[in-house]
Amino acid sequence: MKLNALTYLSLATFSLLVYAACSKDAKKDDPSDVPNPVDSAWTTITDSTINTNNLLVNSSTCPNAPNYGDSIVYVKPKQGGDFFANPVNNIGVNGTYFSWPDGLKINKNSGAINLSQSESGVRYNIAFVKKGTKDTCVSQLIVGGLSYMDAIYVLDQNDTLAKPIFNADPFATSVCDASDDTDYPDNNGNGNNKCVFDDDLPGQKANDQKLRVRTKSGIINLKKSVEDGLFGKNPKNGDSKKVQIRYELNDASQKANQKIAVQVVYYDKASNIPGATQQEVASKRANMLTYKIVNGKPRPPLIIIAGLKK
């Protein structure tokens, strides 16, 4: 899928007029090693510094908008070092790159992205300010991979399964096969040729911590996780656990070893979940479902388990 439009975006912190331009280059991303990449300080931009109310579409005014050859880039297996994606435009053009939301490791001088150290499955805004100008050219880029939707799951409503989403598209068909409750490592589950989940060292698997991740589909059985002791024998309101899941996908990432951490929180009843937390989840879900940037910190996904609705 090619970039067909970029955006003007007004950045409140700098009071700059932000322009967007479409990608005209049909080349695929051409990643290469970049020695000692510098993490851009701009990656700390937060919701309060960005005014998205003036988001406009324009396809011709900003040729310096970062172009990585495609709208999705993927980490790939690499021996001896990290894997990078580089912009295919702005060659020889001096300026500064930055990105938001948090999670992208980008060289502020060259625009090189360290995909091995970036959060995957996330949609990012990437901006470039040409030296000697005040024009901030912005484009969107997705780092391919999976995520889980920020959500509240109510077990007594039979809402028990957290399903992965791929390449920041909540409506995309899964690249993995379906599987059931026979598909766990302690039942000799170890994925298949399409997808492998939770292939980690003994004792470090998500399933070893009682987060029941199916190895072929990546689906998390939340009810089984609680029953098997994710939060201990007697979980309490607000109990929380951050768990890492390793995975490999047989897609454009060519089975590169990737990982995602999820934050799982327990409440006895949905009515016990703090209002601010409910609003945070609702806001992130709304952005994800409408293909918008999830500003601030989209990682880790927040999975809230409530035993009862009321």
What is the meaning of each model-derived region?
Residues 1-35, 40:
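Bacterial Sec-dependent N-terminal signal peptides
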Residues 25-98, 141-210, 255, 260-310:
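Solvent-exposed, low-complexity, repeat-rich "mucin-like" stalks and linkers
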Residues 103-109:
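Short beta-strand segments within Ig-like beta-sandwich modules, predominantly Fibronectin type-III
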